[in-house]
Amino acid sequence: MEKGYKMNRSSVYRNMFSEKPVRVSSIRRSYTARGNPQGSLIIPSSSRSRVSYVTPISSRSVRLVRSSAPVVASSSNLDFTLVDAMNSEFKVNRTNEKAEMIELNDRLANFLDKVRSLEQQNKMLLAELEQVKGKRPSKIGDLYEQELRELRLQIDQISNEKSRVEVERDNLADDLQKLREKLQDEVIQREDAENNLAAFRQDVDDACLARLDLERKVETLQEEIMFLKKLHEEEIIELQAQIRDSQFKVEMDVVRPDLTAALQDVRSQFDKLASKNIAETEELYKSKLADITDSASRNNDALRLAKQENNEYRRQVQSLTCEIDALKGTNESLERQMQDVEDRYNMETTNAQDTISHLEDEISHLKDEMTRHLQEYQELLTVKMALDVEIATYRKLLEGEENRISMPLPSFGSMSLSDAMFEQQPFENRTSKKKIVIKTVETSGGDVISETTQKIED
């Protein structure tokens, strides 16, 4: 009997304490399954966006049994030492459960603080997202459109100014070509005038030579006239001397009139001839001199006209040269201005393209930042849902533990062998068999990467 009592005692102890963790685990699984409205548990992963779904397949009610071993002696009571051991074990379990409850409460408080901080961050991110969506893009778009309109207006103005400058440049080029043609004509006329002037100078030189020749001839004739006058006077003197020295004595009254008349005739003839020669010489000299003077005056007039034309042509050439230099300076200034306009246009175009690229990069950065905020918001929502589910699960676990702790202990002193035998018969029904399916889904950016399913039997 003592051996049977010991066997019953060990069976009761094993059924009371060794099966307890299994029953508690079963109860926790039941609460876990009932905690989620869909019958699933969402377990978040810290390394990646990972969501696990735990779906119970079959669950049957678990009966709380404190004893399943038969009692040999139905009329005798249980040993009170067993009750003391159970009470001490119960106190230890209560202490452990109290510590576990404190730890769970601390974890729950930490989770609630984390949820509050995440909700505040979520609100801040939502406000920032609304601000970025509502204000920043529209402001950037308006600034972009306004600056683009200003740049287009500047481009149109620069294009119009460039066209005007090109037209002015073409007109100046045409004027310059005309002036060059006119200058060429003037140069040709100048060369012709210089050739005519050279010919006139040759004529003037010839006229001067002819005048000098005539002057020499006039001087020669004048010398010849003077010589003839001297010779005539000497002949007259000789004749007078011969007449005085004559041996013939003739009467002066008879002979003198004849000689005087002859001398007078000779003198008159000689005077006539001399006067005639002088007159002819003077007329010839005057005519030659008049011709030479006329020719010289004509040559002088032609030379003066040629000089005037030459001076006029020189002044025209100088004025045209000055005008060409001025046009060249204007053309160079316009070319520099056009180059400056083109450089400024290219620089403004480059700045506009840089601004457009910067705005596009900023818009792309804002879009990426919005996408990142949305992803963070989605992840935070997922974490919040997981935390809500876990908090609900812990709440259900706490309620279940409180209900289990508040349940009254069975009176071992009044247990009979029949009760023990009655409780031992449905032992197979008390062993709960449960299949748990753990479905793990990995997501990244809202897309499903992988999905795994694991089955566990209890």
From Swiss-Prot:
Where would I find the IF rod domain in this sequence?
97-405
InterPro entries membership: IF_conserved, IF_rod_dom, Intermed_filament_DNA-bd, Intermediate_filament, Keratin_I
Q: Which UniProt keywords apply?
A: Coiled coil, Intermediate filament
Q: Show the segment(s) annotated as Tail.
A: 406-458
Among Gene3D superfamilies, the record links this protein to: 1.20.5.170, Single helix bin (1.20.5.500), Vasodilator-stimulated phosphoprotein (1.20.5.1160)
User: Does the keyword section mention Lyase?
Assistant: no
Q: Which domain of life is it from?
A: Eukaryota
Write out the similarity annotation. Belongs to the intermediate filament family.
Name this polypeptide is given: Type III intermediate filament
Q: Which organism is it from?
A: Tetronarce californica
Taxon lineage? Eukaryota, Metazoa, Chordata, Craniata, Vertebrata
